[in-house]
Amino acid sequence: MNAYPATKTLSEEIEHPASEAGRCGPDVRSDLRVRIERREHGGIEIELHSRVEPYYGESIRRLADTVLEELGIRHARVHIEDEGALPFVISARLEAAVRRAGLGKGTRVLPEQVELPEASARDRMRRSRLYVPGSEPKYFINAALYGADGVILDLEDSVHPSEKDAARLLVRNALRTVDFLACERMVRINQLPLGLEDLDEIVPECPDLILIPKVEIPDQVMAVEKRIAEVKSEYGLTRPIWLMSILESALGIENAFAIARASEKIVALTIGLEDYTADLGVVKTSTGTESLYARQQVLNAAHAAGIQAIDSVFGDVGDLDALRAWATNSRGLGFEGMGCLHPTQIPIIHQAFAPTANEIERARKILAAYNEAQEKGLAVVSLGSKMIDPPVVNRALKLMARAQAMGVVQ
């Protein structure tokens, strides 16, 4: 009898740990969980659980086969628990699972790209920007239907640290495949240096604007601008990508003007009040007295630099009356828009930032008086008992242009 045990084959000796990505469960929609167990032989074996399997099971399997093949996976057991995920989500989750296994590096599995919208104008209207968690694909598809001026696919605070890598791929694929209608397509990257890795995946898909969080010094803006330029050069892209810096600390506020002038690509400054008040060690209130200095610093720096000043989000999504008061005050201070955490906030913000009937009527009278004086060759323009100087005329022109852009007047 042979005293030596049988020799195991190489494939029997090697064990590969499983890798996962995505979510499933009764409260999950438009997502899936993927579990991949690599093996040395046997091809691709897919076990699929889905409520829509009778209708889309074969197409899901074909897509999984294609994605895995492009990523170089030839032999694996793949377990998919689907909760109604769209193809771009399925592809992103599979790619994330493969990358978490340490494979597929350098390979980007890209879904078919929809036609890019017209490039965003530097001075376009930015009254509202709706934040959408980058790890929650269920919010992507309908995000544009609520009428915000911009949709922010967020990779920062709304994404758990363990999901940053997977969210990056979801957002990348969403930029390629989701029609965001007339919304400006924005992405909030992570705080540097992690945010630079976000740009490597995001920039090739041509977002309109990148929000840079927790900016404290101009060098951070310049680092983002440099990485964007490098990626655009690598992919031969010429489409503009604008920047919006978020100031969220006492240091950032004190450096507001230098940050606003750090790059020609910056179109707006905004403020993050949750982090700012935490930095001060004070409680954020609905009146905002504790942050008035910071907001005015942002306003003054933005206007001095010739860019837009955008206010923070209003955190209490259930108190619409308080939101209305905040937004009205925000416009009165000189802000041109603010952030939104929930779609119900959008119409209230738009209403607050729209010129009122009285403002429009007064602007018309000012412009009429100015035009009449010009026709008569008069150097002095007056309306009633008040003199009208060039700044007043310019303000009236801007108000009427804004009213026309908002559809308030023809």
Each model region followed by its residue ranges:
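Expand to "…catalyze enediolate/carbanion chemistry for C-C bond making/breaking, isomerization
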Residues: 91-96, 100-410
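N-terminal intrinsically disordered, cationic/polar leader segments
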Residues: 1-121
